[in-house]
Swiss-Prot record:
One of the protein's GO biological processes: transsulfuration
Protein name: Uncharacterized trans-sulfuration enzyme C23A1.14c
Positions in coiled-coil regions: none
Cofactor(s) needed by this chain: pyridoxal 5'-phosphate
Keyword Methyltransferase attributed: no
Pfam family, one: Cys_Met_Meta_PP
Length: 398
């Protein structure tokens, strides 16, 4: 039987690695060390004729009664996610479901987003387009002013930005939102805690595609929204029940399984991403170094990575390392396509944040992006092997 934990996570002073392993302990129903998968869609009501209580409001119950509303595997995954994100969380069947759930709940008249073609998750734009059909939601683009934003509107900040991997200043946009009476939502998929804690930096809500680093094995489709305001999360859970976007028990089980190793994985991702980005940037900027490896440095025009940004706010936002997903602008689309297809240790595939390294010619999924751009998601292989693989293909193209 699902039940409310007897402890408050805020009282636990242990580290992330410990918390993520034990945050869901109070939800254990059996003595299994590995949580079982509960696939039942309906549950027996507890109680006797004298203790049964009629329905009043959909909220967190002390027992599950229908899988569209709650279930043990989902409860456990949310407890673990809350320990990572440092706030109450609600998990969904995908990142897009999390985005739709939050926007339908906030119901703004206007939203500021990143300009298509420059960057930003295309799925967010598609969700906004569909909400526009229902409510007339207006859209403008994020800049240093967001003049069109007013009371109750939303600034949807994605940082680091997909696909480039460059960071934006969360506290700056928090102050901007505050002055306008607006709501700041941060999509922090590219940099989950401990790399970047968007809620601590001032976001009202943080959204993640849990498919990426949080699950991290290319076998889970999930999304999560977190907020310091627990009442808002309870509202979102109630909405989720009627939107039909709860996570399937098996996916929740796999997500929880993956979260156990998240602190170890994200540290390796961060380290490897930094090393590979720095190496590629050196190839692009140090002709003598590139030549010594048999590589034509003109093949790489620019490397976009948050470790290469010089503005002071970057280090203040990304306090726990660097994002491991970033983009490289190459000499031509021909070079881009050959690079993606000829690497040994990189899968030519979309997505990011998994243990295996991925590379993508971005025109495969974004028709507005520069055809010379490739996106790399650096996995947890040995960085030296990944660098050697890249060197090999660049040398063959020189």
């Amino acid at each position: 039987m699902t039940h409310t934990p007897s402890f408050d996570l805020s009282d636990i002073k242990s580290t992330l690695s410990t918390n993520v392993l034990h945050a869901d302990d109070a939800y254990a129903l059996e003595n299994d060390v590995a949580p079982p998968i509960h696939i039942s869609t309906t549950y027996t009501y507890p109680g006797t004729p004298d203790t049964l209580q009629p329905f009043t409001k959909l909220a967190e119950e002390d027992f599950p009664y229908y899988a569209r509303i709650s279930g043990n595997n989902v409860d456990r995954a949310e407890a673990s996610l809350s320990s990572v994100l440092g706030a109450p969380s609600v998990v969904y069947s995908s990142g897009l479901a999390a985005i739709y759930g939050l926007l339908s709940y906030l119901n703004p008249k206007h939203i500021a987003v990143h300009k298509p073609g420059f960057g930003g998750y295309s799925g967010t734009i598609q969700i906004i387009a569909r909400i526009n059909r229902l409510t007339g939601l207006e859209t403008s683009f994020i800049d240093g002013k967001c003049d069109a934003i007013g009371e109750g509107d939303v600034i949807w900040l994605e940082t680091p930005l997909n696909p480039l991997g460059i960071a934006f200043d969360i506290p700056f946009y928090k102050e901007l939102a505050k002055k306008k009476g607006a709501i700041l939502v941060v999509d922090s998929t590219f940099a989950p805690p401990p790399i970047q804690d968007a809620l601590v930096l001032g976001a009202d809500y943080v959204v993640h595609s849990a498919t990426k680093y949080l699950a991290g094995h290319s076998d889970v489709l999930a999304g999560v929204t977190a907020s310091k305001d627990r009442s808002k999360i309870l509202d979102l859970k109630a909405d989720r029940a009627y939107l039909g976007t709860i996570l399937h028990p098996q996916q929740a089980f796999l997500l929880l399984r993956s979260l156990r190793t998240f602190p170890l994985r994200i540290a390796k991702h961060s380290e490897n991403g930094f090393l590979v980005a720095q190496h590629l940037n050196k190839l692009a900027t140090d002709e003598q170094f590139a030549t010594s490896l048999g590589i034509d440095s003109s093949l790489i025009l620019e490397v976009y990575h948050n470790s290469l940004q010089t503005k002071e706010f970057v280090a203040k936002n990304l306090t726990g390392g660097h994002a491991s997903c970033f983009s490289v602008l190459l000499k031509s689309d021909t070079v881009a396509k050959h690079l993606c297809c000829e690497l040994k240790y990189f899968h030519h595939a979309t997505s990011l944040g998994s243990v295996e390294s991925l590379i993508e010619w971005r025109r495969m999924t974004d028709s507005k992006i520069d055809p010379r751009l490739v996106r790399l998601s650096i996995g947890i292989e040995d960085a030296a092997d990944l660098i050697a693989d890249l060197n090999r293909v660049f040398a063959s193209l020189s």
